[in-house]
Amino acid sequence: MEDQEMHLKVRRVADKFTESMYFLANEPSVALYRLQEHVRRSLPELVQHKTDMQSWEEQSQGAIYTVEYACSAVKSMTNSSIYFKNIDSLLRQTISMKEQISNSQGRSPHVSAPSASS
């Protein structure tokens, strides 16, 4: 009987000890300490990821600006084709007028040829 009593007392003490350890392990201050440790370990990596993402965002924004600027330049060039056609037409008219002037000077007896001496 005494042996069973002793066994029961030992079991109660062990249960109380286990309960106390469980309570201490899950106490709010311990939980906050564990949370702090987790943040301390995780934060540098998260900061590095954030820095990398910001750098990639800046590079992407620069590339987007460059592409938009290039598209704008190409669009301006396609819109300027009318001006190039106008210049082409004016150059053709000028060449035609010069040929007419050259032909009329070549037929005119009063016009002297330019001298070759400089």
Swiss-Prot record:
Location in the cell reads: Lysosome membrane
Q: Which UniProt keywords apply?
A: Lysosome, Membrane
Q: Where is the composition biased (Polar residues)?
A: 98-107
User: Where does the record place the region Disordered?
Assistant: 98-118
**Gene Ontology cellular-component terms listed:** BORC complex; lysosomal membrane
Pfam families, sorted: BORCS8
Chain's role:
As part of a BORC-like complex, it may play a role in the movement and localization of lysosomes at the cell periphery. Associated with the cytosolic face of lysosomes, this complex may couple lysosomes to microtubule plus-end-directed kinesin motors, driving lysosome movement toward the cell periphery.
Q: Fetch the PANTHER family from UniProt.
A: BLOC-1-RELATED COMPLEX SUBUNIT 8, MEF2B PROTEIN
**Family per similarity comment:** Belongs to the BORCS8 family.
This chain belongs to the protein called BLOC-1-related complex subunit 8
The species this protein belongs to is Tetraodon nigroviridis
